[in-house]
From Swiss-Prot:
Signal peptide boundaries: 1-16
The keyword DNA repair is assigned to this record: no
Induction conditions: Expression is not affected by carbon nor nitrogen starvation. Expression is induced during Bionectria ochroleuca self interaction.
GO cellular component, one term: extracellular region
Protein's job: Aerial growth, conidiation, and dispersal of filamentous fungi in the environment rely upon a capability of their secreting small amphipathic proteins called hydrophobins (HPBs) with low sequence identity. Class I can self-assemble into an outermost layer of rodlet bundles on aerial cell surfaces, conferring cellular hydrophobicity that supports fungal growth, development and dispersal; whereas Class II form highly ordered films at water-air interfaces through intermolecular interactions but contribute nothing to the rodlet structure.
Localization per record: Secreted; Secreted, Cell wall
Subunit note: Homodimer. Homodimers further self-assemble to form highly ordered films at water-air interfaces through intermolecular interactions.
Deletion consequences: Leads to increased growth rates, conidiation and enhanced tolerances of conidia to abiotic stresses.
Top-level lineage group: Eukaryota
InterPro entries reported in the protein's UniProt record: Cerato-ulmin_hydrophobin, Hydrophobin_sf
Protein name (Swiss-Prot/TrEMBL): Class II hydrophobin 1
Assigned protein family: Belongs to the cerato-ulmin hydrophobin family.
Tissues/organs with expression: Expressed in mycelium, conidiating mycelium and aerial hyphae.
Organism name: Bionectria ochroleuca (Gliocladium roseum)
Length: 98
């Protein structure tokens, strides 16, 4: 009888625990240095992004959504360290999921 009670308690505890991975919102630029999402025309060796603008949705929901909003203006998604405000960004790399 004690064995049955112990098994039932362990089974109940196992069912009460959350299963699987909890979904997190997509972060296109998880790197602390390259944390600014941008849509850029040109990337010169990862040092300077030219023709860069902020995506219409500053935090896209997925890699596909980020690419789609940038491709709508014929640009590519990038993560940059600093934006100059003159459609140029410094230190750019591909975002997460690319």
């Amino acid at each position: 009888m004690q064995f049955f009670t112990t098994v039932v308690l362990f089974a109940a505890a196992a069912m009460a625990l959350p299963g699987g991975q909890q979904s997190r919102p997509y972060d296109p630029c998880p790197n602390n240095l390259l944390s600014v999402p941008q849509c850029c025309d040109t990337d010169a060796l990862g040092l300077v992004g030219l023709g860069c603008v902020a995506p219409p949705n500053n935090r896209p929901a997925s890699p596909r959504a980020f690419a789609d909003c940038c491709h709508a203006s014929s640009r590519r998604p990038k993560c940059c360290a600093v934006t100059t405000g003159l459609e140029a960004s410094v230190l750019c790399d591909d975002p997460a999921g690319f």
